[in-house]
C-alpha cells in the first residue's frame, strides 16, 4: 500500500525527559529500599551474577541510537532518526553504502520525532512543534542540501500529512486547522513549489481518506453517541448519507486502512460483528467483503502492502508475541527468510516503490531494537547501525519470556517475565531460586504490555529483580471481550488479575512472597494505590506515578 500513514504530532523536550528520568530514579531507589535490600550492588551480585552493574544514567539517558528507519521510494537511500549533537535528527545514507551516513537535518533544540520521504525521493518532510506551543509545522529539507523550509504556517496552526503515494510524485495531501481551530481542512501541497491548494473544507469531518492516486474517497465524522460515520467522496463532493458506520464499541478496533491502486478494493481493520479485529477486503464493485486475516485471540494490529498496487500482502497479530502472516507466496518466503536471519519480533517499516528493498525493525525483547536493510533480490540482510541504545552494546541484559497466566475466572493474561542475567542457569524460564519481584502495571488501561525492550525494567533486572508485566482485563489487542471484561472493574476484577499474576509467580518459584513490589503510572498508578489499600499483605511496597486517586 502506498505510504499514507501521515506524520503524527509529537514532541518530547529535554526538560520533560530529564524530569521523567529523575522521577524514575527516585522510584527505583524506593523499590530497592522497600523490598528489603539497601545495597543495589550486593543484590545484583547475588541475584544477577551474569552481569556487572550498569549505571542508571546509561540505562535511562543513554543514546537512543537509530529509530524510524525508512527507504526512499527510488530505493537509493536509507534514513533514520538518531542524535546529532544531542538532538534527534534525520540521517541519510546510500543503500549501497549504509555505513556512510550523514545528518541531513541539524535541529539544535526541538527533536524530530516523525518524518517521511517525498514521493519523488528528492526531499524529506518532518513535523515539528516549535517551542511546545502546539503549532505543528511541516518542514521540507532537500536531499541535495540547503536549509529546511516551512511548508505550512508557523503560528496558530496544527498541520499534518494526510496522504502521499509513489504513484503521485509532485504533490501530497495535508491537513491544516488555520481556518477553524476545531477542524482540519484538506489541502494539496506541491512538493516542489510549496504551493497549497484547498481541496475540501472540513465543516465537522474529523479526517479524510485518499486512494493511491490521491483522489479523496472518504470523509469521517464523529457521532454524538461516540461512533463514526464514513461518507463517500466523489469529485470533491461529500455524500450526506454515510456508506458505512462504526458503532462506539468498535471505534478503537475498526478503521480504514486504504484503497488498492485500481480503486476497487477498500481495506479495513474491522471488529464489527466479531470479537477480534480482522483484516477485511471490501470489493467496492460487488459489495462483497472477504476476511483474508483473522486470529481467534488477538486483533490484527498492523499490515503491509505492495507500494504500487496497494494490495495488502501481510498482516500482524500479537497474542503473546508478534506473528506475521504472508498472504502471497513471495511475502511468505520473505517473512520466513527474515525469521531465519533475525531473532525476535520484526516490524516492516518501509518498502521502496519497486519493492526490492525493505527496512525492517527487529525487537528482540531482551535487547534494544535494531534496524536492517533487506535486499529482496540478493536476500541480503544488513544491519543499519547497531542497537537502538548504542550505550548498551556488548552488555549482558536480562532474559525475557512470554508467558500465559490464567486468572481465577478463566481469563487468560498474556504476560512478560524478565529474569536477571545469570539467575536461570538451566534456561527453563524460571530462576534457580525465588527472587524479589516487581510487578509492572501498564497505563491506560486501554493499552497493552508487550514483549519489547523497556529500559526501566532492564534497570531492575540488572539489579537482581525479576519483573512481570501483564495484560489484565481491559488491556487492548486481545479482542473486544477482553477489553469489555474490564468495564466497571477498576479495583475489582482488574485488580484480581494482578493478584493472580503475583500468586502465579510465587507458585512457579519466581517471586519471594514477602518481597514483591508493584509499580505503575496513570492507570497503573491507580492499581498500585488499590493494591496497597485492598491487599497490603501481598506487596512489600508500591510506586505510584501520577495515578488517579478518586474516580
Which residues are covered by each model-predicted region?
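A flexible loop/linker signature enriched in serine peptidases of the S9 family
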Residues: 63, 81-89, 106-112, 127-139, ...
